[in-house]
């Protein structure tokens, strides 16, 4: 089994999912767009994961590879029916590429915040085994306003309606960061846009406060990430729980 992972910036990778892949014997190929890597042929890959980044889906002038990336997503999901997991920007790109709508939020959502499963989410194979409400790491200023036609909304929050959704049976978007590790906050505050969002939302001590909160909840968040990962593998392999 081999996963293709698209990274927009060096510090936003698979996180804890990388260890899960290693433990499961899954090979990982990584494309680093920040370093100028090109999109490869999708032949031979079991699944496509697209991670987060500080850019927005509409920033095609500054980041012209976004146009190619959206076409890449359409080919993977629509033409090849390749299992897909998009995290944060990866979730927004999935929506934008497939006819949904992504817009700026009224206020940036940053912090450790609760999301709640929808009725579809409670019974969906990707979310099986998760609690009805869970605390997750949020760090975004744009959101999916409209999921692609025929998609299912799986989770919501009071600040952002679309926290998780499914396109068909094998493509998923997670607005929240279930890949979080103990190094995530420290790494991400090095990105100027993220640091600014953090201070505006949580104040001058926001980085330290968020690191402490993540540390306190990390075991639970990683356990929930493992549930999502295992469920995704079952979907990829066509197994039921």
Which residues make up each language-model segment?
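N-terminal beta1-alpha1 cap of cysteine-dependent amidohydrolase-like domains
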Residues: 1-79, 202-241
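Residues that mark the start of a beta-strand
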Residues: 2, 83, 133-135
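Short alpha-helical
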Residues: 11-12, 93, 160, 180
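Short glycine-/acidic-enriched loop or helix-start segments at secondary-structure transitions
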Residues: 15-16, 59-61, 95-97, 148, ...
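Glycine-rich, phosphate-binding/catalytic loops in enzymes
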Residues: 20-23, 64-68, 101-103, 154-155, ...
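Cysteine-nucleophile active-site neighborhood
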Residues: 50-121
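Pocket-forming structural segment of enzyme catalytic cores
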Residues: 98-183
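C-terminal helical/coil "lid" or tail adjacent to the Rossmann-like core of SAM-dependent
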Residues: 170, 179-214
